[in-house]
């Protein structure tokens, strides 16, 4: 982490601390939603407001121990996540850190810990195209077999609009997520992509909702049918079965991939999900259900600011698989606690909720 901080020259100092919101002096070119590393431990945060030479930063980790005068590093980048083979079956926290991998070294997440969800594994890449072919953003270059899924390697958005010539593509073989597998117009393409969590995917037009989402729960499919590409809310008071219904949909829905976001959920309920889901079988493929799921665990005892990011993180991952042509179900439990987090952050900023 210390080596990463040395790469940046834009620094500030902490001027005020209010819970998860830190006020810092900042460079002139600081922008909204820019990533900042706060304090000597490099706590991850995002700029949420800029006022003249000061920036308000929502910190995604515990701010206990921060002091007035501690340094703040402004990176000039937006919050992003590495997307590629190896995501399926993982359990992430609200800012995309792999809890399973972090748990191998300690039962607790140390402050200032930053680790990508993918990396270090080798994957068998099978190219679809040849040298000299012209490709554009979203075109499929090849595939990697991930569990029971075909993980399609796509041309990233950074290539820009229009078709460009592919000057080189790797032969079939094993590659890590950081290996270059293609060169397009002089730009190196790796097995993984980095997507900004806050930036929505470009959409040309919205498609009609003409296909049903079969939830596997008869009372919903008969009396409250859902559509692929649609949205639904399960309202209700405490203990009325909202979480149980959502978990049932996650198990039995006819979506190809399920992103389950535990946003501010009680720790015991999220523990139940983490214990039960790995034991369940996918009846369609006779494989573990977790092979087509990604769990985002951001319980109520985790930092409030990370609840907001967890929803955007889940949507970003879902859009990535959606672009491959898969039907993806996003289940967020619960939106009300996400709204509570937004209200608390607004209160810390002394702004309207």
Predicted regions and their residues:
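N-terminal accessory targeting/assembly segments
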Residues: 1-103, 107-110
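Conserved, well-folded catalytic cores of nucleic-acid-processing
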Residues: 17-20, 39, 50, 63, ...
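Short alpha-helix capping/helix-loop boundary micro-motifs
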Residues: 20-25, 55-61, 120-130, 165-170, ...
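Short, well-ordered loop/turn sites that connect or cap secondary structure elements
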Residues: 28-31, 66, 129, 135, ...
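Short, compositionally biased
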Residues: 49-55, 85-96, 148-173, 189-205
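P-loop NTPase nucleotide-binding/switch module
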Residues: 102-146, 152-158, 176-231, 245-248, ...
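The Walker A (P-loop) glycine that initiates the GxxxxGKT/S ATP-binding motif of P-loop NTPases
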Residues: 236-237
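Conserved P-loop NTPase nucleotide-binding/switch module
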Residues: 240-257, 262-263, 267-269, 276, ...
